[in-house]
């Protein structure tokens, strides 16, 4: 965490400054802002440390997203002709024709996010199915039904879903590079000896080798259903 830094983003039109919150190393804008699809955002961080000024920078172009999620449904997961006693969230939408777009999935139950960090979310590449209507007849014929989220149980083994719950799906459009970063981070978490030796996590922050993390401008669409 970097505390006491000057943090701002420039998009060629405006400069947006971030203020450090009461939680050291966390920065937020004073007012809510919305990104613009197709626009490139440049992150700049200046910090004075060890009697020297250090400058870190990165850029990200916001990817196009799907126009809308037409509908979502929650039902038992079925794969390979077998049905399982777990619930999956199935979305129906026209996918992006750009094969470089990846999708990051998060969900909320009664407005409470299931993953507080995007690093814990599942990321999908639909490169081989770009332009298909996801979970439509042709998609299912070629690839099978795709649950974008599977609901587990709580620590007592009970379903985290209850009848009448409001369930919201968040569909983020992200770059392949950010998807790889998420994979890299999760590949370095844990002490399982079968995971192999730790390796360098990818980053788009410069100067190279001087910082860790990733800067991503992501667009999001959402849809809600009552279970």
Where are the regions that the model predicts?
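A sequence/structural signal for flexible, mid-protein segments enriched
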Residues: 1-227
């Amino acid at each position: 965490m970097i505390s006491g830094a000057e943090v701002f983003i420039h998009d060629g039109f405006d400069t947006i400054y971030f203020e450090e919150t009461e939680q050291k190393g966390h920065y937020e804008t004073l007012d809510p802002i919305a990104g613009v699809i197709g626009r490139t955002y440049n992150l700049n961080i200046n910090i004075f440390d060890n009697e020297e000024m250090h400058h870190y920078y990165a850029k990200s172009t916001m990817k196009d997203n799907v126009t809308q999620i037409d509908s979502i449904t929650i039902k038992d997961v079925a794969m390979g002709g077998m049905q399982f006693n777990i619930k999956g969230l199935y979305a129906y939408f026209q996918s992006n024709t750009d094969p470089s777009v990846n999708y990051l999935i998060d969900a909320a139950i009664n407005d409470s996010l299931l993953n507080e960090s995007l690093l814990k979310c599942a990321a999908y590449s639909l490169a081989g199915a770009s332009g298909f209507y996801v979970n439509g007849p042709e998609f299912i014929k070629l690839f099978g039904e795709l649950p974008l989220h599977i609901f587990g149980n709580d620590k007592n083994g009970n379903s985290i879903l209850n009848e009448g719950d409001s369930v919201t799906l968040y569909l983020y459009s992200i770059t392949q590079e950010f998807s790889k970063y998420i994979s890299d981070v999760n590949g370095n978490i844990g002490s399982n000896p079968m995971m192999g030796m730790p390796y360098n996590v990818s980053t788009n922050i410069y100067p190279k080798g001087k910082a860790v993390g990733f800067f991503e401008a992501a667009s999001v669409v959402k849809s809600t259903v009552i279970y």
